């Protein structure tokens, strides 16, 4: 989630990213969050298929952005991505080079926008295809380690 968030934020010129996780949550209508990071990368050559599996955008969907205050970001981190409006939110991971300040507004690359959030803010289609962003981002590395998740 950290690498995907950094990739999506940098590709869209966003200040930070909120990436929802595709964890199983009892009581939700489907077994999976289709707007979240769904897998891990392992020590091996990474293929386009590997990227399509982990990316919330799959093969061809674009990255969404929103403008949020630090307080809204904090609230979303506490509640998660409530995909079904039932209060059972998929957790968000914050990927940011700085700790968001409560009163400041940030452009956020976001993976998982609930109906409530969409009603409260403007969701923008960045026009950047997630797979294209991932190929450019991951293609810059010959190897990837946990240290590469750092964004400063």
Residue positions per predicted region:
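Catalytic centers of hydrolytic enzymes
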Residues: 1-152
């Amino acid at each position: 989630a950290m690498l995907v968030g950094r990739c999506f934020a940098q590709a869209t010129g966003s200040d930070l990213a909120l990436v929802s996780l595709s964890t199983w949550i009892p009581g939700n209508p489907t077994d999976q969050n289709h707007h979240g990071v769904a897998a891990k990368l392992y020590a091996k050559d990474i293929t386009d298929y590997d990227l399509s599996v982990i990316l919330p955008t799959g093969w061809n969907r674009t990255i969404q952005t929103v403008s949020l205050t630090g307080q809204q970001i904090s609230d979303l981190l506490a509640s998660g991505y409530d995909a079904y409006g039932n209060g059972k939110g998929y957790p968000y991971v914050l990927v940011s080079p700085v700790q968001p300040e409560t009163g400041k507004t940030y452009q956020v690359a976001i993976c998982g926008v609930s109906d409530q959030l969409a009603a409260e803010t403007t969701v923008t289609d960045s026009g950047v295809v997630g797979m294209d962003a991932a190929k450019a981002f991951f293609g810059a590395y010959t190897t990837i380690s946990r240290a590469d998740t750092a964004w400063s």
